[in-house]
Amino acid sequence: MDPDRQADIAALAATLTTVERVLDVDGLRDRIQKLEQEASDPNLWDDQSRAQKVTSELSHAQNELRRVEELRQRVEDLPVLYEMAAEEEGQDAENAGAEADAELAKLRVDIEAMEVRTLLSGEYDEREAVVTIRSGAGGVDAADWAEMLMRMYIRWAEQHDYPVEVFDTSYAEEAGIKSATFAVHAPYAYGTLSVEQGTHRLVRISPFDNQSRRQTSFADVEVLPVVETTDHIDVPETDLRVDVYRSSGPGGQSVNTTDSAVRLTHIPTGIVVTCQNEKSQLQNKVAAMRVLQAKLLARKKQEERAALDALKGDGGSSWGNQMRSYVLHPYQMVKDLRTEYEVGNPSAVLDGDIDGFLEAGIRWRNRRDDD
């Protein structure tokens, strides 16, 4: 085998060994065994919330272990592919060598993607995520853009078999949405999606302009970790104002004949949360409380960071505005303004193919935090 190929394979094997050590593969196997025992308990589904959490954790752990084991097998198989190519002659040898090179390149990409997972070591990175999208400047185009972003993230979650729970959708009058809040129920969803927080900018020919002029639209993405009992985010009833109303759909149409939608106002902070996608008022209140607790946790941590930055004499860093630009006209390009990562296929990106942006964002964040 070519010495350069041998060196490449050895480097990939070493990187994968590091990944296996950081992920604690033996500990992962033990965790799967315990979760399987818990999942087999016939009484588990008496607590729906707990059952869903256990099955979700089990599925994620099994998928993670399978990915690592498959990568290890591919690393071990790669020298065999090159040996088989060396035994061929003429065009067959050339084709077999090209196939081995293609597998080497793909394996490098897949191992690097797995390596990114080891960078998610923040305090809340392993949590599930609550995502809120709000339309910004740009009128009806901005509302449509916010809905396109919502679809992008939901498609990404579906491609990874991550359950999504939509808490609230506030529809705009003509098209699109004013805002939406949904949860992505998967381990490390927060650590992964938190790099998406910021302002997303769309440039395109407006489908709502009868003169077909180019329009720039903005939408803001907020990503919060799901609150757990260990976070001690208590909200006294005296701090809440609860309003109920009828759920509404596109164009302001009522989609429910009862006052099942809930609006919670946290009086001390003025934070307002709404939920209307559940079937009952009680379910909507519970879901709204989960989002409110996530927002209060984020506020608490933000205040702690601000105090620490003041002590350091550091203004702190922010994701800032326009963290990513999506251009559909006059050319086609999606570019992250922090990482410089870019893709010339906006259709694929808007259909949920954002792993490259997520991986680049996570690496960028870790480099920034190390500085």
UniProtKB/Swiss-Prot annotation:
N5-methylglutamine modified-residue sites: 253
PROSITE patterns in UniProt: RF_PROK_I
Post-translational modification: Methylated by PrmC. Methylation increases the termination efficiency of RF2.
SUPFAM superfamilies: Release factor (SSF75620)
Any GO MF annotation of the entry: translation release factor activity, codon specific
UniProt keyword list: Cytoplasm, Methylation, Protein biosynthesis
GO CC terms of this entry: cytoplasm
Compartments where found: Cytoplasm
SMART domains: PCRF
Gene3D superfamilies in UniProt: 3.30.160.20, 3.30.70.1660, Release factor
Predominant location: cytoplasm
Pfam family membership, one: PCRF
Family designation: Belongs to the prokaryotic/mitochondrial release factor family.
Functional description taken from the UniProt entry: Peptide chain release factor 2 directs the termination of translation in response to the peptide chain termination codons UGA and UAA.
Protein name per the record: Peptide chain release factor 2
Source organism: Mycobacterium sp. (strain JLS)
Lineage of the organism: Bacteria, Bacillati, Actinomycetota, Actinomycetes, Mycobacteriales
Gene name of this polypeptide: prfB
